[in-house]
Regions:
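A detector of low-complexity, intrinsically disordered, Ser/Thr/Gly/Pro/Ala-rich segments
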Residues: 26, 31, 51-53, 88
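Short, surface-exposed beta-strand/strand-loop-strand elements in extracellular ectodomains
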Residues: 16-36
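Solvent-exposed serine/threonine-rich low-complexity stretches and specific carbohydrate-binding patches
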Residues: 36-47
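Beta-sandwich interaction modules
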Residues: 46-69, 74-75
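Acidic/proline-rich low-complexity IDRs
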Residues: 23-25, 42, 56
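C-terminal interaction-tip segments
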Residues: 1-8, 14-19, 65-67, 73-93
Length: 93
């Protein structure tokens, strides 16, 4: 199996749908509080806007275990419009 290392994650809301919070973490827990050590970020997505994690340098971003999932979850009411989620990462052996 491979490990992923997060470089940057961006969430884009192209239509008016209210402010949203999106949590990003490693693992398959129900939410970011399942294992706080695996938390990456909570993004505050403005109405009709976008937000991103900070950009990590190569070999410095959060790194998952072998075959570990990268998970994201909406906090509160999920959006009713389409959102784009762009994940930039590298794979490591």
């Amino acid at each position: 199996g491979r490990r992923i290392r997060v470089l940057r994650v961006q969430v884009i809301q192209e239509q008016t749908d209210g402010r949203r919070l999106w949590e990003l973490y490693l693992g398959t827990g129900a939410d970011i509080t399942t294992d706080p050590a695996k938390a990456i970020d909570i993004l505050d997505i403005p109405n009709d806007g976008e937000a991103a994690t900070r950009t990590f340098l190569r070999d410095e971003g959060p790194r998952g275990e072998r075959d570990e999932a990268l998970s994201g979850r909406w906090l509160g009411t999920p959006p009713t419009t389409v959102h784009k989620i762009i994940v930039e990462y590298t794979e490591e052996s």
